[in-house]
Design a protein with these regions (language model features):
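Activation of the activation-loop gatekeeper triad in protein kinase-fold domains
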Residues: 1-6
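Active-site activation/catalytic loop segments of kinase-like enzymes and analogous catalytic loops
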Residues: 8-46, 61-84, 92
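Alpha-helical bundle/repeat cores within regulatory domains of eukaryotic proteins
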Residues: 55-61
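Long, low-complexity C-terminal extensions of enzymes
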Residues: 85-109
Length: 109
């Protein structure tokens, strides 16, 4: 259960939210966050393949583009702070999706 969004979600949900929405490219790419996360799951006894973890992470990253758009629609773009937040949030989200080639997931629908 995700108490922030009050919904049942994939384990990679919070990881994707943090990494794709909050981290700048250099920090995002400095470490294999999905592998690190997966190793922690495995160390706690979770049986889950890295490939499945990466696939679900990509799905979550694509999903969070919606969050970025919704949040940006509520910002005051008339001031520099709101404009900078919107540019950062959308920029991080779109860069992440491009790096992950997550738009290709839409071809499978």
């Amino acid at each position: 259960v995700d108490f922030q969004a009050t919904c049942k979600s994939a384990p990679e949900h919070d990881l994707a939210y943090f990494v794709t929405q909050s981290l700048k490219r250099d920090v995002r790419n400095a470490k294999d966050w999905v592998r690190f996360y997966h190793e922690e799951l495995i160390s706690e006894g979770v049986e889950y393949s890295l490939e499945d973890c990466r696939a679900r992470y990509r799905e979550c990253a694509l999903y969070f583009l919606c969050y970025a758009v919704v949040i940006c629609s509520a910002l005051d773009l008339g001031n520099e702070r709101g404009k900078l937040m919107a540019e950062t949030l959308l920029g991080n989200s779109l860069e992440s999706i491009k790096e992950l080639e997550a738009f290709k997931l839409l071809e499978t629908l």
